UniProtKB/Swiss-Prot annotation:
Keywords noted in UniProt: Carboxypeptidase, Hydrolase, Protease, Serine protease
Residues annotated as catalytic: S116, E212, H277
Coiled-coil blocks: none
Protein's recorded name: Putative carboxypeptidase SCO6489
Family: Belongs to the peptidase S66 family.
InterPro entries attached to this UniProt entry: Carboxypeptidase_A_C_sf, Class_I_gatase-like, LdcA_N, Peptidase_S66_N, Peptidase_S66C, S66_fam
EC nos: 3.4.16.-
PANTHER family named among the record's database cross-references: MURAMOYLTETRAPEPTIDE CARBOXYPEPTIDASE, MUREIN TETRAPEPTIDE CARBOXYPEPTIDASE
């Protein structure tokens, strides 16, 4: 798996666009998130349709065309240094094919942040733009608004990524050992749903795969993992990092399933790595070569997630 292009780190005064590719955004949470960004001396701008709600499908932040237009306009605006998603939910799969990927590639690299439903965009940005992205807190997310650890880890990644090149999670080994690879992954359900789509990568070979999910029954997690196994998508994966399983069954019931489905891969697996739908979620860059030490619960990036400007 190849290393991807790193966008430039942010500096004080950088303009960041907030977009909503998925679900509708509560205005009060958006405003609170904007206040956090302003407190970092950033200049946040809100895309035109962020507060929209679809007339028929109220789980969408407006129409597919409007959500895609907001993301593309923000990405192609030369004054914008970073694009932050407001929240997840559902909707990226509906709008991803409406994006003009050639125009977005021509606009050059910039920082992209999000998680959950945004997993589909992490995959598309990797396959279509060849770009490092950040799996991290979103601008209108409760954890981002209220949790100092989530805020500070994202802030350090954006402004001083060399200070968080070693990500220490406190995680423990499900399968001990060390592994090297290029980071990738996100929400398990979205990775399974992405198979066979125009922006899906052929597999996780040579990768350090990050997996998490929210609100799923254990049998569904079994189904998603089994689909990835049967399709060959997990063939040759270097190691696995397991994040949070919020609103799923108690972990003592889920853990045997994860061991059953992933233990046969013969690679290190670390659990409770502290990313995803959890309190104080860590920011994990995707597309960066790294070493996983499952025994110590650390991920050491070969180089900072974002490069120096110029």
């Amino acid at each position: 798996m190849r290393e991807l292009v790193r966008p430039a780190r942010l500096a004080p005064g950088a303009r960041v666009a907030v977009v909503a590719p998925s679900g509708p955004v509560p205005e009060e949470r958006l405003q609170a998130g904007l206040d956090v960004l302003r407190g970092w001396d950033l200049d946040p701008v809100v895309a035109p349709h962020v507060l929209d709600r679809h007339d028929t499908f109220d789980y969408l932040a407006g129409t597919d065309a409007d959500r895609a237009a907001d993301l593309q306009a923000a990405w192609c605006d030369p004054a914008v240094d970073a694009v932050l998603c407001a929240r997840g939910g559902y909707g990226v799969q509906r709008m991803a094919d409406l994006l003009d990927w050639e125009a977005m590639r021509a606009a050059g690299p910039k920082v992209f942040v999000g998680f959950s439903d945004i997993t589909a965009l992490h995959e598309a940005f990797a396959t279509r733009l060849g770009l490092v992205t950040l799996h991290g807190p979103m601008a209108a997310g409760i954890d981002f608004i209220k949790n100092a650890r989530a805020q500070e880890h994202l802030r350090a990644t954006l402004f001083a990524p060399e200070t968080v090149r070693v990500i220490t999670s406190g995680g423990t080994p499900l399968v001990p050992g060390r592994a090297r690879g290029v980071t990738l992954g996100g929400c398990l359900a979205l990775l399974a749903a992405d198979l066979g789509t125009p922006h899906a990568r052929p597999g996780a070979r040579g990768g350090l795969l990050c997996l998490e999910d929210v609100g799923e029954e254990t049998y569904r997690i079994d189904r998603y993992l089994t689909q990835l196994l049967r399709s060959g998508w997990l063939d040759g994966v270097g190691g696995v990092l397991l994040g949070s399983w919020a609103q799923c069954e108690p972990y003592e019931r889920l853990r045997p399933l994860l061991a059953d489905r992933l233990g046969g891969l013969g690679v290190p697996v670390v659990e409770d790595f502290g990313f995803g739908h959890c309190e104080g979620a860590l920011t994990v860059p995707f597309g960066v070569p790294a070493e996983l030490d499952a025994d110590t619960g650390t991920l050491t990036l070969d180089r900072p997630a974002l490069c120096s400007p110029g």
